[in-house]
Swiss-Prot record:
PANTHER family: LARGE RIBOSOMAL SUBUNIT PROTEIN UL30M, MITOCHONDRIAL RIBOSOMAL PROTEIN L30
Species this chain originates from: Leptospira interrogans serogroup Icterohaemorrhagiae serovar copenhageni (strain Fiocruz L1-130)
Signal peptide limits: none
Name of the protein this chain belongs to: Large ribosomal subunit protein uL30
The protein's assembly and partners: Part of the 50S ribosomal subunit.
A Pfam match: Ribosomal_L30
Source taxon at top rank: Bacteria
Gene name per UniProt: rpmD
Single Gene Ontology MF annotation: structural constituent of ribosome
HAMAP family (UniProt xref): Ribosomal_uL30_B
Keywords: Ribonucleoprotein, Ribosomal protein
One GO process term, biological-process aspect: translation
Length: 59
């Protein structure tokens, strides 16, 4: 499995509750925070729903 690094680049203030919960599930709680994840179909769906708030890079 391939690893990726997910970085939160925009604040979650004023976004839908579902998006806040998705960021929390990804382990992102504040702007600039990074987490390393293994790529999976479930993760891809989560990243797609909050793509306007995050940046994704290959690890």
């Amino acid at each position: 499995m391939e690893n990726i690094i997910v970085t939160q680049v925009k604040s979650s203030i004023g976004v839908k509750k579902e998006h806040k919960l998705t960021l929390h599930a990804l382990g992102l709680r504040r702007t600039g925070q990074q987490r390393k994840h293994k790529v999976s179909p479930q993760l891809q769906g989560m990243l797609n729903s909050v793509r306007h708030l995050i940046k994704v890079e290959k690890a």
